[in-house]
A protein has these predicted regions:
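Positively charged n-region of N-terminal signal peptides that target proteins for export
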Residues: 1-5
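Bacterial N-terminal signal peptides
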Residues: 7-17
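Sec/Tat signal peptide C-region and signal peptidase I cleavage site
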Residues: 18-25
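Short, glycine-/small- and polar/acidic-enriched structural segments
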Residues: 25-175, 191-197, 214, 221
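Short glycine-centered helix-capping/turn motifs at secondary-structure transition points
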Residues: 49, 76, 188, 207, ...
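Pocket-lining segment of extracytoplasmic ligand-binding domains
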Residues: 179-275
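Secondary-structure end/capping motifs
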Residues: 235-321
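Conserved C-terminal helix/tail region of periplasmic/extracytoplasmic solute-binding proteins
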Residues: 306-350
Length: 350
């Protein structure tokens, strides 16, 4: 009886040892992420174990903006990071930051926006109700989270469509967190804001100001965020980065499917609620499909990012000191290899 009793214990011990060995053998990726639904593909892949399945241990540090992760990225504390397409990114690369963009992490695809313009109820009552009315924003205060951000780019593109000079015809209120901008709108401290869609949704529901134009209308296919890697990490650990991309792209497929029909994918909705600032699955469902769109082949929207660099160079703004080339900014081979291997190897069964 003692011998029979030892067999299960031995099996358990061997199993635990194997699991511990697997954990030790997993390749570590130190990643900066932010709690935003545009990164849904990553959150899904992480929650469903796709990175683990491909032998990766993704260790996440949370940042509220990709720009805030740059110092840790440059110092070598991080291997990869979510990275917003902002003026600071171009300046960092121009100064030698070892950053290369490898994957799409959300953009304003027509029908699947992530950003939205809200205006005060007073302005809406005066007839500012769509992009066609942006001319009435002349002389008004427009709030965005940061100077040179995707939000400022979107709002500026809308002002240009209305024939306004975005540098001179409005007063920019910058470097204010989006939740605070939402409240400032309700208090009349700003006249218009460009926010993540869920903040615009909250503002409208709280009667602080209606949504009047989404980012897919202002700047169709505008890049919201990307994944970037340190160049030295990519060179030394290319297969690790490709496997990261494979797991991520599987998550992206499920993210896009759920955005179109959230009722069909309750588990995905719960994952997104728990991983983001939204927290409430009902809100996640309510704002669908306005979660952003990520390309299922992983390709970043190169033309959009290069357009942003041109925009911040002039003639209206001069936030980028020196332009960088497409070759300096991107390594598109990672997405290509990851998609090819995902289709060929089918590690997730589909």
């Amino acid at each position: 009886m003692k011998i029979l009793g030892a067999v299960p214990a031995l099996a358990i011990g061997i199993g635990a040892a194997l699991l511990a060995n697997d954990a030790r053998c997993a390749d570590v990726v130190r990643l900066a992420e932010g709690p935003f639904i545009s990164g849904g593909g990553f959150f899904i892949a992480q929650a469903l174990g796709y990175f683990n399945k491909l032998g990766l241990d993704v260790q996440v540090r949370e940042f509220q903006d990709g720009a805030l992760a740059v110092p840790s990225f440059v110092s070598g504390e991080l291997d990869m990071s979510f990275m917003t397409a902002n003026a600071g990114l171009f300046n960092s690369v121009a100064k030698g930051a070892p950053i290369v963009i490898i994957l799409d992490r959300g953009h304003n695809r027509p029908g699947r926006p992530y950003t939205v313009i809200n205006v005060t109820q007073a302005l809406a009552d005066q007839g500012v109700r769509s992009l066609a009315d942006f001319g009435k924003l002349k002389g008004k205060r427009v709030g965005v989270g940061a100077l040179g951000s995707i939000n400022q780019f979107n709002a500026a593109k809308g002002l240009l469509k209305a024939g306004l000079d975005p540098a001179k015809d409005v007063q920019w209120i910058v470097n204010v967190p989006q939740p605070d901008l939402m409240k400032m709108l309700g208090q009349g401290q700003v006249d218009a804001t460009d926010l993540a869609y869920h903040f615009g949704f909250f503002a409208q529901n709280n009667k602080w100001g209606p949504m009047i134009a989404t980012g897919d209308v202002l700047a169709p296919n505008g890049q919201i965020a990307t994944f970037a890697a340190r160049r030295d990490f990519l060179v030394k650990n290319r297969d690790v980065v490709v496997r990261f991309a494979m797991a991520y792209l599987q998550g992206v497929k499920e993210f896009n499917a759920a955005a179109e029909n959230p009722a069909k994918y309750p588990r995905i909705v719960d994952i997104l609620a728990n991983a983001t600032t939204l927290k409430n699955p009902d809100v996640v469902r309510a704002i669908a499909p306005n979660w952003s769109y990520s390309n299922e082949d992983g390709m970043p929207v190169v033309d959009s990012i290069m357009e942003m660099q041109d925009f911040w160079t002039g003639p209206y703004f001069h936030l980028v000191e020196k332009k960088v080339t497409q070759e300096e900014l991107f390594d598109l081979s990672i997405a290509k290899e990851a998609k090819a291997r995902l289709d060929r190897e089918k590690p997730f069964g589909n």
